[in-house]
Amino acid sequence: MNSSDEEDIALSRLAKKSSSITSASTYEDDEDDDIPLAKKSRKKRVESDYEEDEDEVPLKKLSNGRAKKQVKTETKVKKEPKSANKSKSTSKKDTKVKKEKTTVKKESKATSTKVKEESKTQSDSQASVKSETPEEDQGYKWWEVNQEEEGDGYIKWQTLEHNGVMFPPPYEPLPSHVKLYYNNKPVNLPPEAEEVAGFYGAMLETDHAKNPVFQKNFFNDFLEVLKECGGCGVEIKKFEKLDFSKMYAHFEKLREEKKAMSREEKKRIKEEKEKEEEPYRTCYLNGRKELVGNFRIEPPGLFRGRGAHPKTGKLKRRVVSEQVTLNLGKDAKIPEPPAGHQWGEIRHDNEVTWLAMWKENISDSLKYVRFANNSSVKGQSDFKKFETARKLRDHVDSIRKDYTKMLKSEKMQDRQMATAMYLIDVFALRAGGEKGEDEADTVGCCSLRYEHVTLKPPNKVIFDLLGKDSIRFYQEVEVDKQVFKNLRIFKKSPKQPGDDLFDRINPSLVNRQLQNYMKGLTAKVFRTYNASKTMQDQIDIIENEGTVAEKVAKFNAANRTVAILCNHQRTVSKTHGDSVQRINDKLKKFMWQKIRLKKMILQLEPKLKKKDSKYFEEIDDLIKEDIEHIHHTIIKRQREQAKKKLERDNEKLKLEGKPLLTESDIKDKLDKIDELEKEYQKELKTGKPIVTKNATVEKLKQQIETLENRILNVSIQLKDKEDNSEVSLGTSKMNYIDPRLIVMFSKKFDVPIEKLFTKTLREKFIWAIESADENWRF
């Protein structure tokens, strides 16, 4: 299922840009002569007939309270007939795949490899998709197959078979004693309304539930559901009189019971869940097993939204099979719908790559079940996306030259187009689009309004708007002086707050202009190009020296530059402070251990303090209170570990039907901990740790060296955590930076790929890991 992280607005300034995008014009106080001849009073405009690229069009209504932006167009783009592309598609055989020319190849090694034989076929009469492990078909390495022969037409597959979607379990009514109270009296709710009330009751103490907008939207939808199911015998009029405390207490009890489950119980539940999900996890594409992405229908609940979303708190209604459209091969067996239900529609559309689809009620948009991120379909899509971005390097200079010249065009539409292209290129803005009144007011380039931009002569611009996830974006940047003049013109009277700055263009026209230079070029491709090019430039200036931890920190700094460019912000997590404190505590513990070892050395060789005073100058750095706290933490942790081991052992004994252990059985262990505590207390008084029998100065110095390396690594980790607390590195790494750059860094700098890619990303970008080498260039 698609999850969109494409709604953020990137306005962060690129550190430095090529001089080719800077105009030589100078700022003038009087700019009336600079206004394009085409600029007149605002007239009614006609909408563009140009259709946006499929990936760029949001599945949301574009209308809002203001009049829809209408744009002058001079020509229309003809849509290529399907037949033209269909002829390019190739029929795939399920017998043997010939030895093909490698397309995603290592730049320095011109090698070709054989593709494993595909001998797996699927019977048309098969009752359901087989549930073997997907590893069976992971021998298929699409990146070693000539992509041109694979075809890039309309036909996406020849055969497709799957088991449909997994629905959430039906609602289980609350125990009879758990009630919603209204005006201090219990209310008997119908099951449908009780379920909705329970959604709010379960999150009573969260920040969302305390949000007035959330409360209002929930209450309106709750009353609507109550009305649909015949009411409850009580007239509920005011939200303030509702008491969810009994419901909240019930759900808290369930949460505590879940936490208290034994490891065996949790394991059993997990295994049952995996067994239930197994049939839906895989499908067969052209006879080859592929993993399915999110095969679950979203459960009903209250919509939270990100940032200041106007629909937060609204009810996400339960989806039934009658609302679901399945897409599969004509000869594939249609999965059985839930008992008593039927599918909304069955399609056999091999020009799309989704498996199921339905419409959700919050934004009235379509939701899809698609192939998993590590599937061949998604992998090829990612590869083509980054290859398209790479091709932009052959056109970017001419594009910049043209839009720089067009910044002074006599036509207002051209001048707006050039200014938008400048902002998209230099500051990685999204093209943007109009938002409805009931959508979060996030902004892109074409949807910038009068109030979002403040001008400070001679060439500074302040952007102040809602960016990704409705997080406020505020930044002051320097722009080309001609761009500054143009923005000043775009803001001139009669424009006022609420009016669009770019009232002669829209995202469709911007993408159309870009596609004049290169097939498939859009604002999104430009954004991907700039992100990857910036990462390449940052890697080029990193020195190949230091420890792995130091190299990872340098990599993260480069990644952070890209994230800032793309405005991938995030709010500081609630646990950030605790996490930083834990790292600081770990640093203090290592420091204490190092000082303790140095004190042992001085007990063995007291004269060393004078001979190497610098080496021992830190032995008094920790105050008594810090040392006491470290002692307490160590003892407490050891006791907790002993008790947890006792619990684990008892769980095992219980399953085997053997007598359980008691604390008396671990008395020796607890006694040793008590002895250690006494030793620490004595050490705190005397300042002299007990030296072990076999200790030597050389051995102690080796231990100190090990600790110093740990201290260095943890210090780097702490700085990295602080630097990235408000920046999301993962978004650019997953969507905008060519993964082959990261693989190149891993191999060139001898950093394990596990340090740079999570397990999920390693699976998603296996094609990059196996195809790029240390010399790869974007």
UniProtKB/Swiss-Prot annotation:
Residues 367-368, 430-435, 522-524 are annotated as: Interaction with DNA. The active site is at residue 736. It comes from the Eukaryota. Its EC number is 5.6.2.1. GO terms for biological process: DNA strand elongation involved in DNA replication; DNA topological change; mitotic chromosome condensation; nuclear migration; rDNA heterochromatin formation; regulation of mitotic recombination; regulation of transcription by RNA polymerase II; rRNA transcription. Residues 17-26 have a biased composition (Low complexity). GO terms for molecular function: DNA binding; DNA topoisomerase type I (single strand cut, ATP-independent) activity. Residues 71-83, 100-121 have a biased composition (Basic and acidic residues). InterPro entries: DNA_brk_join_enz, DNA_topo_DNA_db_N_dom1, DNA_topo_DNA_db_N_dom2, TopoI, TopoI_C_dom, TopoI_cat_a-hlx-sub_euk, TopoI_cat_a/b-sub_euk, TopoI_cat_euk. Residues 1-141 are annotated as: Disordered. Residues 374-778 form the Topo IB-type catalytic domain. PROSITE patterns: TOPO_IB_1, TOPO_IB_2. Residues 122-131 have a biased composition (Polar residues). The record marks 306, 354, 385, 442, 468, 511, 568, 586 as: Interaction with DNA. Keywords: DNA-binding, Isomerase, Topoisomerase. It catalyses: ATP-independent breakage of single-stranded DNA, followed by passage and rejoining. GO terms for cellular component: chromatin; cytosol; nucleolus. Belongs to the type IB topoisomerase family. Eukaryotic topoisomerase I and II can relax both negative and positive supercoils, whereas prokaryotic enzymes relax only negative supercoils. Releases the supercoiling and torsional tension of DNA introduced during the DNA replication and transcription by transiently cleaving and rejoining one strand of the DNA duplex. Introduces a single-strand break via transesterification at a target site in duplex DNA. The scissile phosphodiester is attacked by the catalytic tyrosine of the enzyme, resulting in the formation of a DNA-(3'-phosphotyrosyl)-enzyme intermediate and the expulsion of a 5'-OH DNA strand. The free DNA strand then rotates around the intact phosphodiester bond on the opposing strand, thus removing DNA supercoils. This is DNA topoisomerase 1. The lineage of its organism: Eukaryota, Fungi, Dikarya, Ascomycota, Saccharomycotina. The gene is TOP1.
